[in-house]
Amino acid sequence: MAARLWAAAVAPATLNPPLLTLSASSSPSSSRLRRSVLGRLRSRAPRPADFVCRRAKNAAYDDYKFPDPIPEFAAQETSKFKEHMMWRLEQKKDDYFGEHVEEIVDVCTEILGTFLEHDYCGPGTLLVHPFLDMKGEIKERGLPGAPQAARAAIAWAEKNIDKDWKAWTGEY
């Protein structure tokens, strides 16, 4: 029934007359119904440009403090990362990296180590920037396989860093 009313309100001339027999009456209730159906089909008024998420606006920013970076954790994680990257890139040495595996691993390790030591503050703070920096630095130095090395670094970091942080700090 509602579909017929909608169809009658939208394009009465294009429909077959037998479909309009129930909805073509001119009673006041059918016109009210048509208006309410059409009212629901219209899009909502646009939101103001300065729309702010109420939850974020009302939340106290003190609730979102992260701990300081832990240099010992950064050193341990960097050595694990270097070991893994050396193993991973050696597997693809012939395809992408050639004789530059150690140089590429050193670049990636230096960048990740700096990030972990100064910027990583626990789960939720692992950013994409160090991995973009890895790719850019490898390319700037003219070394091969920048995208592949950055991808391998991201895969390892996603799998290990947050988990190792939780084990290190005892937050399970």
Curated annotation (Swiss-Prot):
Keywords: Chloroplast, DNA-binding, Plastid, Transcription, Transcription regulation, Transit peptide
Transit peptide endpoints, chain numbering: 1-54
GO cellular component, one term: chloroplast nucleoid
InterPro entries: PRIN2
UniProt keyword annotation of Transcription present: yes
Biological process per Gene Ontology, one example term: regulation of gene expression
Record's subcellular location: Plastid, Chloroplast stroma, Chloroplast nucleoid
Function, as annotated: Required for the activity of the plastid-encoded RNA polymerase (PEP) and full expression of genes transcribed by PEP.
Official protein name in the record: Protein PLASTID REDOX INSENSITIVE 2, chloroplastic
Organism: Oryza sativa subsp. japonica
Lineage, highest ranks first: Eukaryota, Viridiplantae, Streptophyta, Embryophyta, Tracheophyta
Originating gene: PRIN2
